[in-house]
Amino acid sequence: MYAFYSLLIYIFYSLFRRDGGAAAAAEPGDPAQRARKPRGRRRPDLPAPELWTELTGLAASSEPEDGSEGAAEGRAAAVSLEEALLRLAEFLSVQLGAEESCGGPADLGQSGEVPSLLTVTSQLLALLAWLRSPRGRQALLQGTQPAPRVRPPSPDGSTSQEESPSHFTAVPGEPLGDETQGQQPLQLEEDQRAWQRLEQLILGQLEELKQQLEQQEEELGRLRLGVGATDSEKRVQHLTLENEALKQSLSLMRDLLLHWGPGPPIRAPQEEAEALLELQGRLQEAQDTTEALRAQLGVQEVQLQGLQGALQQLQQETEQNCRRELQQMHGQLAGLRARMASLRQGCGDLRGLVSTFTQSCQGSLSEARGQVSWALGALSSGGPGTQLPEGQQGPPAGCPGRLPELKGNIRVLCRLRPGTSSSLVSVEPGPGGTVTTCYRGRHRRFRLDWVFPPDASQEEVFRELEPAVLSCLRGYSVCIFTYGQTGTGKTYSMEGPPEDPGIVPRALQSLFREMGAGRQHRVTLSMVEIYNEAVRDLLAPGPPERLAVRQGPEGQGGIQVAGLTHWDVPNLETLHQMLKLGRSNRATAATAMNQRSSRSHALVTLTLRAASPPRAPGTAGTLHLVDLAGSERARKAGAAGPPRGDPDGARRLREAQTINRSLLALGGVMAALRAHRPHVPFRDSQLTRLLQPALGPGTTAVLLLQVGAGAGQVCACRSPPTRARPPAPLARRSPRGRRISGRQSAPSSSPTEWVKWSWGQPGAAGSRAPPGRLLPSAPTLRSPGPPAPLRRPLAVLHAPVPTTARARLSRPQRACPSSPGSRPCPWGLRPGLCWQRR
């Protein structure tokens, strides 16, 4: 908008300063004149085309008579016209500033919407153009009053003229024509009518400006009643600017009327004084209103600052409260998670106890049926009064159901490698034998279930393990594994050469021989190795792949290996071929201690399912044969600090570290089982996870400890922190579930005398079964002499139920009337089947 008004003023100023001769020469129809017209499309901020046409016509009508006179008159008129245009520009700038503060000026480019200010300006410029026209100059040259000083007609219809102080005189030597003198009255009348119209128009504009001023004052009064401090201040500023613009407009109009129009009417001094006082009063009132609004604005700003401070404080308090509540919720969530974990653990323990109790009851029932069947057969064949031959403590070998009894659910045997120095290790061979080690001047003595001398044969070792192997035909789970340092003969004891087979070939031969004596079983074989904590199938058709070990579904229990192949074995020859295939796929390597060292743990699992009476269909026994990799020191094995770029040395070091960690985890499991801890860390390694079914409740584990000839190997077997603790002092259990100290041995290998001795030991009455171990009771066999008195009734033992599991029991708790001093059974068993000391 500023550019538009500035351009308009510049055009008017240039139009009236043009040389008179050039203006006269430029005709409307001149080609040069038409060539100078602007081309292209019109700018949107320019006035309407009709206004441009009117201004162009006014400019063309101003033609001086000659060059000299036009120059002289142009200079005289330029001074007053420039002053008027400067005032007009000042007024327009103030007016535009007020309009922009209100929200922007109106669009002048729209057709038919020419502002009234431009109309007044065009009329004023038309008057100026008439003064510069030949007729106006003739009037000036004739000595008449200029057009700006023409008075409007009087009320009686006559016109009067006033001489300006600076009137022009006629130029000497220039005569006036008769025609000009004749047209003078007509011209004066036309000028008088034009001045009257102009005066009326200007007075109308003044009235409009006054009305706008009154409207702005009314708007200012309404603004005083407003509530918003910021809007009031903006409105005051806007009204102030608009008031200034109106004052400038009024002053400009007055100056134009005083300079170009008729003189203002003479007012009395008293009226002027009253008007001045009224204006001063209005000004004072406006100033007072402004000050009041400013004071109100300051008060509201103070209130706003206070509210902002309160809001900030409230936000901080709310944020702190939310954070505190969030922390409390996190704490409660952590507590709920821990409680949920404990509840899940208690539920799992309870399920394990229920499953174990069910299995033990089924085993006891099956065993009792077999014994009853054998007793009935013996009585029917021998008649009444038949007694067993001297030296025979059980049913003969050919009778169905005749199997050697177990001597405990955890048994530890020790075998010395030939060539062991007697200065380092001294033994007392036989059942309940002792092993005494001497290392760095310190002697330690271990008592084990059985100690084999260095010259013991493979047959002697297997003869002691045969009862445990054959017990899997009655539905038991048996695990036999060897433990020792690298080079102590573990693989030799388990496999053995073809001419002198070890435990595995002899156990398989004994099982198939026993099954061939009239029993029908289905034999399933699986073989895996644990290499660097990776479980691989050694009997898979393709290359060995890593298998995933998972917990079995709820209600079934056990450990499941996804993708493991199970093979049905029809005969012994096929079984040996498959075992040979599995051994060839096992990871072995040469170390500084052994030419062919096993670098992984091998686990052979045989599952035997009975399919004919007297065993019910579905009864299954499991035999786990484990060949553990030897524990070793990295320095002695040649794997300590391998040089860079030696992949074999780095691989040996990693294998040794993994083997030692898994054996240490196995030692932790054994220690937990020995101490009857409620939690057994089976998940510490893949080895213990796979052995969890073999080391759980109702199973039998036989550990064959291999001791080498060197001093370092003796040290490895007796250093518990860094190696798997040798389970020599582990407690073993009788066939009826009684716990017997590992440091005391039975006086004889006879099952009858061993059972009598175990139940008659002084410290046996105070022992308790480990948590979760419910073992089946074995029948009491007759002996030539009277048995030792029992310290407590022969019954199924159970461990204290965990608190989380006890809370979930819904069965009624009853006390056993036959055992005074007893407390209610958490399992809700009927009287006489449960006994528990306070």
Swiss-Prot record:
Entry GO CC: cytoplasm; dendrite cytoplasm; kinesin complex; microtubule
Domain Kinesin motor: 409-740
Family annotation (SMART domains): KISc
Start-end of Low complexity biased regions: 23-32
Stored PROSITE patterns: KINESIN_MOTOR_1, KINESIN_MOTOR_2
Coiled-coil zones: 186-351
Region of interest: Disordered: 23-48, 140-185, 718-792
GO molecular function list: ATP binding; ATP hydrolysis activity; microtubule binding; plus-end-directed microtubule motor activity
Gene3D superfamilies (alphabetical): Kinesin motor domain
Entry annotated with the keyword Cytoplasm: yes
One Gene Ontology biological process: synaptic vesicle transport
Alphabetically ordered keywords of this record: ATP-binding, Coiled coil, Cytoplasm, Cytoskeleton, Microtubule, Motor protein, Nucleotide-binding
Positions annotated to bind ATP: 484-491
InterPro entries in UniProt: Kinesin-like_fam (IPR027640), Kinesin_motor_CS (IPR019821), Kinesin_motor_dom (IPR001752), Kinesin_motor_dom_sf (IPR036961), P-loop_NTPase (IPR027417)
A Pfam family assignment: Kinesin
Keyword Electron transport recorded: no
Biased composition range(s): Polar residues: 156-167
Predominant location category: cytoplasm
Protein's cellular compartments: Cytoplasm, Cytoskeleton
Chain's role: May play a role in microtubule-dependent retrograde axonal transport. May function as the motor for the transport of multivesicular body (MVB)-like organelles in dendrites.
Homology family: Belongs to the TRAFAC class myosin-kinesin ATPase superfamily. Kinesin family.
Protein name: Kinesin-like protein KIFC2
Native source species: Homo sapiens
Gene: KIFC2
